[in-house]
Amino acid sequence: MKYTKQNFMMSVLGIIIYVTDLIVDIWVSVRFFHEGQYVFSALALSFMLFGTLVAQCFSYSWFKADLKKAGQESQHCFLLLHCLQGGVFTRYWFALKRGYHAAFKYDSNTSNFVEEQIDLHKEVIDRVTDLSMLRLFETYLEGCPQLILQLYILLEHGQANFSQYAAIMVSCCAISWSTVDYQVALRKSLPDKKLLNGLCPKITYLFYKLFTLLSWMLSVVLLLFLNVKIALFLLLFLWLLGIIWAFKNNTQFCTCISMEFLYRIVVGFILIFTFFNIKGQNTKCPMSCYYIVRVLGTLGILTVFWVCPLTIFNPDYFIPISITIVLTLLLGILFLIVYYGSFHPNRSAETKCDEIDGKPVLRECRMRYFLME
């Protein structure tokens, strides 16, 4: 498996989006504070801290595990870097430094790699894979709530400043990029999996995730206008169901019990917004049930709004928002069907094997026990 120049450029673009997302979030939080909207400022800052703290915890845990596996002692400087929220930046530094040598210093077109070159490419792919997992964590823990908050503020006031529009656009870009980057890293890091080749499969997968996410987020925003307590109760209930589902599947991503517990909590949170295969098993039935419930929940929220329209909500917005919710949901389901019916790399497999145990394992990788697709 080779780490190409295209992969290196994707890593560079990834850190640009990461830094931009971080700067915009801080900018929005400070702007809310100066405008006297202290609750919105605190929420925006809390979402950002929640995502980055969880990412730092997993990053440091993986650093310790890798050092232990290599027979080295854990270094206190890594702990300090993660306490200062620099763990992801440290990983980007190592990944880009080694990735540059793998992509540009060696001839990637040479088929006869020496052992040193193979080890370098394997090392870089593993580092980039770790980053894609951390970015996926942080994006869904911070980006999804942040996007809901910004959409709520936009619809409540009927207008927004440039920073809020920037936050919405950057959040969408971050969610989109981390989702596709994760899918590419998933298949590149596991040699027994087929690669996601071509632009069409990636775009189709992106639209499937993005449209279903956007539809659900707008539905949640409408429910927040109806009743904040009901909306929060629904989200907490779905979070609890996701955690129970993770425990029922007995995920085994972390060697440490406490980190595995945190992982299942995070998985439950991600399942509020989108579906992922948390154990690498056949997901046709669970995915179908998930999106049937999603469709019913979305239609239920829209029905309540049509039956009991709110006077505090601008009626001029409701019709276009309702149309947007329905269209994005339908498009998301359509792209889901197209992706799994035409573009999924495993669709033409002769035998259906368990994603984890059905095929011979060529090498160990954290991604093997992480969220599938």
Swiss-Prot record:
<feature type="transmembrane region" description="Helical">
    <location>
        <begin position="166"/>
        <end position="186"/>
    </location>
</feature>
<dbReference type="Pfam" id="PF09815">
    <property type="entry name" value="XK-related"/>
</dbReference>
<keyword id="KW-0053">Apoptosis</keyword>
<dbReference type="GO" id="GO:0006915">
    <property type="term" value="P:apoptotic process"/>
</dbReference>
<keyword id="KW-0812">Transmembrane</keyword>
<feature type="transmembrane region" description="Helical">
    <location>
        <begin position="224"/>
        <end position="244"/>
    </location>
</feature>
<feature type="site" description="Cleavage; by caspase-3, caspase-6 and caspase-7">
    <location>
        <begin position="357"/>
        <end position="358"/>
    </location>
</feature>
<comment type="similarity">
    <text>Belongs to the XK family.</text>
</comment>
<dbReference type="GO" id="GO:0005886">
    <property type="term" value="C:plasma membrane"/>
</dbReference>
<feature type="transmembrane region" description="Helical">
    <location>
        <begin position="318"/>
        <end position="338"/>
    </location>
</feature>
<feature type="transmembrane region" description="Helical">
    <location>
        <begin position="8"/>
        <end position="28"/>
    </location>
</feature>
<keyword id="KW-0472">Membrane</keyword>
<dbReference type="InterPro" id="IPR050895">
    <property type="entry name" value="XK-related_scramblase"/>
</dbReference>
<feature type="transmembrane region" description="Helical">
    <location>
        <begin position="203"/>
        <end position="223"/>
    </location>
</feature>
<dbReference type="InterPro" id="IPR018629">
    <property type="entry name" value="XK-rel"/>
</dbReference>
<feature type="transmembrane region" description="Helical">
    <location>
        <begin position="295"/>
        <end position="315"/>
    </location>
</feature>
<dbReference type="GO" id="GO:0016020">
    <property type="term" value="C:membrane"/>
</dbReference>
<keyword id="KW-1003">Cell membrane</keyword>
<feature type="transmembrane region" description="Helical">
    <location>
        <begin position="256"/>
        <end position="276"/>
    </location>
</feature>
<feature type="transmembrane region" description="Helical">
    <location>
        <begin position="38"/>
        <end position="58"/>
    </location>
</feature>
<keyword id="KW-1133">Transmembrane helix</keyword>
<protein>
    <recommendedName>
        <fullName>XK-related protein 9</fullName>
    </recommendedName>
</protein>
